[in-house]
From Swiss-Prot:
One of its GO terms (cellular component) is cytosolic small ribosomal subunit. This is Small ribosomal subunit protein uS3. The gene is rpsC. It comes from Brucella melitensis biotype 2 (strain ATCC 23457). Residues 214-236 are annotated as: Disordered. InterPro entries: KH_dom, KH_dom-like_a/b, KH_dom_type_2, KH_sf_prok-type, Ribosomal_S3_C_sf, Ribosomal_uS3_bac-typ, Ribosomal_uS3_C, Ribosomal_uS3_CS. The lineage of its organism: Bacteria, Pseudomonadati, Pseudomonadota, Alphaproteobacteria, Hyphomicrobiales.
Length: 236
């Protein structure tokens, strides 16, 4: 089942945590969930060029806190913080609550699965050869500390008559191992021949302690190399 299931969902509560972190009163859950979907769709569309990795939504008492993980925080903040203030006001109108907006920089976008998938999708739209795009992404990730990476591209690759799936892997990607810190991301490339799908799995090592926040803390700190205290590396 580890081959089929979303690797982030499989590890929730083990070494990953949820991207929406709030509790709802009876009857409010559906409304707040729909609100979260609208917030994510709005920010993803509004900040296409900002290389957004993920959006975390928290709801303290009658407030809303949105944290955007981005490889290009300067695009979101704008000149003297003007753009981020406009975004905050729009989000406050959408949620009807006092909304705060935080930006977290992704220090190593080359090992972030979502950003890798977005990059490959953009290259496919620019008619870059899919094998070259995949190989370049794999080499960059391995050079910057990933222990393994797998990339799947599917669709009418290269304008072929029949859709197919091509994949490229380097290193280890142990999908069944729950303690493995595996990042997963997807993207769509809208090409002249139709939509091509991109899936990326990045293995960043093993998290030995039981801590649902461990993976996020490591990503924020840029500690993708890991340390001997919380990660076990396999000997070659």
């Amino acid at each position: 089942m580890g081959q089929k299931i979303n690797p982030i969902g499989l590890r929730l509560g083990v070494n990953r945590t949820w991207d929406s972190r709030w509790y709802a009163n009876t009857g409010e859950y559906g409304k707040l969930l729909h609100e979260d979907v609208k917030i994510r769709e709005f920010l993803t569309e509004e900040l296409k060029q900002a290389a957004i990795s993920k959006i975390v939504i928290e709801r303290p008492h009658k407030k809303c806190r949105v944290t955007i993980h981005s490889a290009r925080p300067g695009i979101i903040i704008g000149k003297k913080g003007a753009d981020i203030e406009k975004l905050r006001k729009k989000l406050s109108e959408m949620t009807n609550a006092d909304t705060s907006l935080n930006i977290v920089e992704v220090r190593k976008p080359e090992v972030d699965a979502t950003l890798i998938a977005q990059s490959i999708a953009q290259q496919l739209e620019r008619r870059v050869a899919f094998r070259r795009a995949m190989k370049r992404a794999v080499q960059s990730a391995m050079r910057l500390g990933a222990e393994g990476i797998r990339i799947n591209c599917s669709g009418r690759l290269g304008g072929a008559e029949i859709a197919r799936m091509e994949w490229y892997r380097e290193g280890r990607v142990p999908l069944h191992t729950l303690r493995a810190d595996i990042d997963y991301g997807t993207a769509e490339a809208k090409t002249a021949y139709g939509i091509c799908g991109v899936k990326v799995w990045v293995f960043k090592g093993e998290i030995l302690e039981h801590d649902p926040m461990a993976s996020e803390r490591r990503a924020v700190e840029g500690d993708n190399q890991g340390s001997s205290s919380n990660r076990r590396r396999e000997n070659a």
